């Protein structure tokens, strides 16, 4: 399976690089060029509210709550892990979770590299480093929060192997990488049909990863639903708040290198 994942990565990476150019976005800026460590309190608040109120966040969270009714969580987990309708066995489902989650990581890296970030090698590299830093922090925040909740909740897994069931780290990791990759696709100069198809692939990889964890008897449905919601939240929040790709109505601070040191820029839109 790892070999197949490598092939998947190479194909995805190569295809996206063919789509890439050293140019800029439609606004004349490079992807990652305007990444900021402080986008402003108003911007942070607006993005947080917008992200929390999107269906991709609140629907899974609502679903996780519904699964607490009449022991639906335990009942579906028991049925899925016993019948294994998609993967045929708990072991195969366990292997599938890695097989389907790893490509989301590769897809994020590939789409990040494929985005237009400048006309010169220097500007391209600097913008990439800044943009990649935002994505790295998003992934780290998602993983750290997931692990904190695991230690706090201490929910025993369906197979009773440990008390780290809630929420699913594998699912949240797949979700945050898939979300970042999907946002990167919006910066690529490709037709809408291709963009939509690739976003569907990202969503499908996350969904299959989540279900495989349930069939593997390693998580309850609510574990993976919360994990998916968290991954999407952190991916979207950091992308929209810190990458500087959309209009910012608050003061922002941007750091950047220059020939003999660094520059600090203070700017706002009006």
Residue ranges and their predicted role:
Residues 73-84:
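Interfacial/capping segments of alpha-helical transmembrane domains
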Residues 113-119:
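Conserved, well-structured interaction surfaces
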Residues 22-28, 63-75:
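Alpha-helical transmembrane segments of multi-pass membrane proteins
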Residues 65-69, 106-108, 144-150:
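C-terminal TM-helix exit segments that contain a strictly Trp-centered aromatic cap at the helix terminus
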Residues 88-110:
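Interfacial helix-start motif at the membrane-water boundary
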Residues 60-65, 102-112, 176:
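Hydrophobic alpha-helical transmembrane segments of multi-pass integral membrane proteins
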